[in-house]
Each structure stands twice: as structure tokens, then as C-alpha cells.
Amino acid sequence: MPWIQLKINTSGKVAEQLGDTMIESGAVSVTFQDTHDTPVFEPLPGETRLWGDTDAIALYDAETDMNAVIAMLEQEPLLGVGFKHKIEQLEDKDWEREWMDNFHPMQFGKRLWICPSWREIPDPSAVNVMLDPGLAFGTGTHPTTSLCLQWLDGLDLEGKTIIDFGCGSGILAIAALKLGAARAIGIDIDPQAIQASRDNAQRNGVSERLELYLPKDQPADLSADVVVANILAGPLRELAPLISDLPKAGGHLGLSGVLSTQADGVAEAYADKFTLDPVAEREEWCRITGQRHTS
């Protein structure tokens, strides 16, 4: 069905209050969007952090009397009479089909492809991971996931054990298994991520070689030849003592989820136990890799 979209520019300080008023006026949903595409990263737990200059965007049923909606919103002290706004009629589309049409197989490195299940596999002789977007992060489209997949493709994983710390969809652990790893261990704080990883591993025929744990359940003596953690800079710094002990002597470490401006701070937290490689960058994100000291 078609929808009517109402966009109002406001400030981050009052955006949520305005959103509540838009819901009261009959909106079926309200979203907030940065007017200038400025990213916001790592809000504190329980915090909804918004931009200084924010667009509040509400959707209304196509039959809604928008004159009545505007009249109601003009009573809101935050807006007042004659406030600036933009109303658009949204085209009725098969949004699911349009979304699926825009998701294509992607190649990472020389051997590895990530393919949605509804697309034909471009190279049957390659290492193909079948993965559809779902509840947890990680389909290969984000620069940090891409950086980690390319790194894994360049390693000799034959017979190795890998730990995917913050496994999300399981994409990194599953890719490692299909690239030759003998065993993978996925750890995540989100039970939905654990389930998504389990489902994706089964779809790719590697579930028997993938172990999945919530942090409270993980064995105390975990170690691996390769450890990858694609989370965020804050947790990578805070958890450095734990993550640093996971790779075996001579083992490989890959860290991402880090902005290029945060790379030095994260690298410093691992420099005492690892010989670090030059930082790899993509867009505004980076990947930090290294090898654990043998003594």
C-alpha cells in the first residue's frame, strides 16, 4: 500500500519528543536521520544518541488527512504555526523484492565469495558461503566485515582452529571453515546472534565443526591459531587482556570494527604481545592484524 511521508528538521535534543507527538498525530512509524550524514558510534548502554541537526521522518497511511496532522503539530510548542516540513507520497513497491534485487554475490580476496541463496553462484569452483541478511550483523557489505573476510582469505587456514569473537551472523567463522579451518569457535553476547550463526552454519554444511558460546558459557582454556574480533574500538580496548590471550604463540590476530582515527589507541592495547602489521583501511574503517610473540 502507498504511504505518506512527513519530514521535519529539528535538533537532536528534542527529536524524540517530536517523534512522540508525530505518533500521537497518527504516524505508524517515526525514524530519525542525520541531516548531514554524520555517523554516530558507540553510544553508552541505554543511551539514544542523536545528531545535532536531525530529520524526524514519519509515515502515515495514504488516507490520512495531512492538513489535520499539520494543524495538530502546529500546536506543539517545539514547532509552532507555519513550521517547515516536507510531505511526499511514497510509491507502492514490492519492497522485499526490491531489497533482494539489490543484494548480489560478493568476492573477497582470491577464493572467497559470499552469495545470497536466491542468486546463482558466479564461480562454483570457488569457496562459496551462502548467507542471507538476517537478525545479526555480518553479510559482507560493511567495510569491516569485508576487511576481515579478505584477511581470512589470505591466510593458510588448513587444519587450523579459529575463534570468532563477537560472531554476529557467524560469517567469519563459517568462511574460515570453508577456507580449510578444522574447527571454529564463535562467541557473542547476543543469543540471537548465536542462533543466527547456528542456522547459517547448518545452511553451509559446517555446523559440526562450529562451537558457539555466550561469554558466560565459554570454556576457560580457549585458544586458537587464528582469532578475529570484528566488534568496536571501545570493547576491543577494554577486552584486550582477554582477547590477547586467545591466540596461541605464533598465532594470528585480526581486529576490526575500528575507525581509522581509533586505530592507534586499539593497536597500543595489543602491541606488547603482538608484532603488528601495517593498518589496512577501507573508507573510514580499518583492520589491525598481527602475530603473537613466541616468547
UniProtKB/Swiss-Prot annotation:
GO CC annotations on file: cytosol
Transmembrane segments: none
Main subcellular location: cytoplasm
GO MF entry, a single one: protein-lysine N-methyltransferase activity
Keyword Cytoplasm: yes
Annotated compartments: Cytoplasm
Keywords on record: Cytoplasm, Methyltransferase, S-adenosyl-L-methionine, Transferase
Keyword Cytoplasm set for record: yes
Annotated EC: 2.1.1.-
GO BP of this protein: methylation
Entry similarity comment: Belongs to the methyltransferase superfamily. PrmA family.
PANTHER family, A to Z: ELECTRON TRANSFER FLAVOPROTEIN BETA SUBUNIT LYSINE METHYLTRANSFERASE
Function: Methylates ribosomal protein L11.
Name this protein carries in UniProt: Ribosomal protein L11 methyltransferase
